[in-house]
Amino acid sequence: MCGIAGWYRRGGRMVPGDAIVAACDRLKQRGPDDSGFLVEGDFGFGMRRLSIIDIAGGRQPIFSPDGRHAIIFNGEIYNHPELRRELAGSYDFRTDHSDTE
């Protein structure tokens, strides 16, 4: 079990970063092992993580290789080892075992 929080403000108004942190702090019981946040202008999201798969390398948010895109993921992809092998030639994985990447 993990927890995700997000905030979007229309009209280009800045999202208060401390509000995302506070929202995720309220989710600590859902994910006591780790937290991660991203605030960019009018959008922000954060997460609390219960570390099960790739405890050290699965920190979030995870960014695309060019840094333009970020993801926070809550779920499990059970066949991620097979998918990783299948995509190995076309994607440069940065973690060893994360099912998010």
Name these PLM-found stretches.
Residues 1-101:
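N-terminus-centric sequence/structural signature that marks the extreme N-terminus
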